[in-house]
């Protein structure tokens, strides 16, 4: 295991921001040679790092602080009326934990989602290599939660189990099921899963107020925000 105090970090050159137009971003990466276990991953998550494939990263932008790490304290979470309706609407779904998503069924769902929902993003066009590199890791901490309706796969959530919570990595779903609000349901399901495991938090990544794709996270209350290296609770 690598030690947090001796961990090497590498910063990228400034590059166009993926979330905000006309902004430059700098990303801080953990040494890809570091041996990551649950303890180190938890410590890094508490410092605002996220996983993308086998890489752990955090924004380190010189002129912008728009990306704010956030997490839900699951035992204090109180759903809104809209969130309760979403939960009830999807009670006809079954959730399954699976050990791998390297199957044609999973990849076809991912492809359909990216092609219809994120044609303007850096994950388009989708490829199988990019899919595996983005969602899987070799740390044995990742869980894959299938959402099925009458046996048909309509959604999948990728999350990592930390020492103090779950980290929601990514969710994709069948765009034809948009009326179900499966992204919202997946967060609610992961909150319940974290509670069931006796964990304290669901890490949601970055809240970005000015970005529609990232601003929705503020709807989950209470919400902890990492501000000036301290977690502050927003009720």
UniProtKB/Swiss-Prot annotation:
A Pfam short name: ATE_C
Domain of life the protein comes from: Bacteria
The protein's role, per its UniProt record: Functions in the N-end rule pathway of protein degradation where it conjugates Leu from its aminoacyl-tRNA to the N-termini of proteins containing an N-terminal aspartate or glutamate.
GO cellular component, one term: cytoplasm
EC number in record: 2.3.2.29
GO biological process, one term: ubiquitin-dependent protein catabolic process via the N-end rule pathway
Catalytically driven reaction(s): N-terminal L-glutamyl-[protein] + L-leucyl-tRNA(Leu) = N-terminal L-leucyl-L-glutamyl-[protein] + tRNA(Leu) + H(+); N-terminal L-aspartyl-[protein] + L-leucyl-tRNA(Leu) = N-terminal L-leucyl-L-aspartyl-[protein] + tRNA(Leu) + H(+)
Cellular compartments annotated: Cytoplasm
Family: Belongs to the R-transferase family. Bpt subfamily.
Keywords for this protein: Acyltransferase, Cytoplasm, Transferase
Primary site of residence: cytoplasm
Top class in the EC scheme: transferase
Record-linked InterPro entries: Acyl_CoA_acyltransferase (IPR016181), Asp_Glu_LeuTrfase (IPR017138), N-end_Aminoacyl_Trfase (IPR030700), N-end_Aminoacyl_Trfase_C (IPR007472), N-end_Aminoacyl_Trfase_N (IPR007471)
Name of the molecule in the record: Aspartate/glutamate leucyltransferase
The keyword Acyltransferase belongs to this UniProt entry's keyword annotation: yes
HAMAP family in the cross-refs: Bpt
One example GO MF annotation: leucyl-tRNA--protein transferase activity
């Amino acid at each position: 295991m690598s030690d947090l105090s001796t961990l090497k970090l590498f910063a990228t050159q400034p590059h166009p921001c993926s979330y905000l137009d006309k902004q430059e971003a700098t990303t801080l990466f953990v040494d890809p040679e570091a041996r990551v276990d649950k303890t180190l991953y938890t410590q890094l998550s508490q410092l605002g790092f996220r996983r993308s494939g086998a890489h752990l990263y955090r924004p380190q932008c010189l002129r912008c602080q728009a990306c704010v790490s956030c997490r839900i304290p699951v035992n204090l979470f109180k759903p809104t009326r809209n969130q309760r309706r979403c939960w009830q609407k999807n009670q006809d779904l079954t959730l399954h934990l699976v050990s791998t998503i390297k199957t044609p069924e999973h990849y076809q769902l991912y492809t359909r989602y990216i092609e219809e929902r994120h044609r303007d993003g850096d994950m388009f066009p989708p490829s199988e290599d990019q899919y595996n590199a983005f969602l899987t890791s070799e740390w044995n901490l990742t869980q894959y939660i299938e959402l099925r309706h009458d046996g048909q796969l309509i959604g999948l959530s990728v999350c990592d189990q930390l020492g103090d919570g779950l980290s929601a990595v990514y969710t994709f779903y069948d765009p034809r099921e948009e009326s179900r609000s499966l992204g919202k349901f997946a967060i609610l399901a992961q909150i319940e899963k974290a509670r069931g495991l006796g964990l304290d938090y669901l890490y949601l990544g970055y809240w970005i107020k000015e970005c529609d794709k990232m601003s929705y996270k503020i709807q989950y209350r209470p919400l902890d925000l990492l501000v000036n290296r301290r977690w502050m609770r927003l009720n």
